Curated annotation (Swiss-Prot):
It holds the Pfam family OTCace. This is Ornithine carbamoyltransferase. Belongs to the aspartate/ornithine carbamoyltransferase superfamily. OTCase family. Its EC number is 2.1.3.3. It is an enzyme of class 2 (transferase). It comes from Bifidobacterium longum subsp. infantis (strain ATCC 15697 / DSM 20088 / JCM 1222 / NCTC 11817 / S12). The lineage of its organism: Bacteria, Bacillati, Actinomycetota, Actinomycetes, Bifidobacteriales. One of its GO terms (cellular component) is cytoplasm. Pathway: Amino-acid degradation; L-arginine degradation via ADI pathway; carbamoyl phosphate from L-arginine: step 2/2.
Amino acid sequence: MTPELRHMLRDDDLNHEEQKQVLELAIKFHHDRFYKQPFAGPQAVAVLFDKPSTRTRSSFSIGVAELGGYPLVIDKSGSQLGRGEPVADTARVLDRMAYGVVWRTFGQDRVEEMAKYSTHPVVNALTDDFHPCQILADFQTIAEHRGGVDNLKNQTIAYLGDAANNMANSYLLGGAVAGMDVRVAGPHGYLPRPDIVADAKRVAAETGGSILVTTDAKEAVKDADCVFTDTWVSMGEEAEYAIRSKPFWDYQVNTELMALAKPDALFQHCLPAYRGKEVTAEVIDGPQSVVWDEAENRLHAQKALLTWLTGKARGDESLLA
């Protein structure tokens, strides 16, 4: 197997078969947390945070350690990036020391520049545009509740709320890669960028999926297999909550809306959740909710992704399955 440097910067960086490989590997890690240890040594992986985090920090820190590596966790305040050092300079330095970079930051251009100057895998742990690691965990969760990864292709998923945010974008692209029927609903002014919708439709045409963007929450949820939402106000916008939340009340996931989905529909939320806002307590704490499985699967999915990317970079086929 020829070594091939691969990064995970947006959801369509994996094709259909590659996404399946990573998800199958994630399920194996769920059954055996020490299934593979590609970083035995220990070799360091730089884990950078420009934004606060609970799930991403804990899952990558624990995950790299369980893969046999050392997670070098650096906050914005503790790095020269926080003082304006060019991304390219930081990338060149980390590339001489670490065996990969995981970065939770703001602009998508920042992770893309990091990857440009790296000879090891770079993983987008969240940007303003995409959240691909979360989508892998979400799809792993569906697969585990629906009989396996092969059954993802038959799923209809619906995302409600701020349809212009990174989660909506990643559901569009990641769902298209999986061959799902993806529905995204939000109010006017909070819909996905046309270029992202176009990319999702192009991929869906290749995988047999479909894409629907609508302002009608009921249309999106009707007969869906899984319903997703996210906070209506992203990090840094909390002071504007009263103003920003007004357009979204028709998209609250409640028992009435869930009743329009299939009777066995799942509910997922990437967290943190605000009960009584984007979702009611009856739903997120109810029998259809799988949010705690979803949160745990961040660990397994990200370990699978790091292992797969490392296998590609080294030309080591044993790390791909």
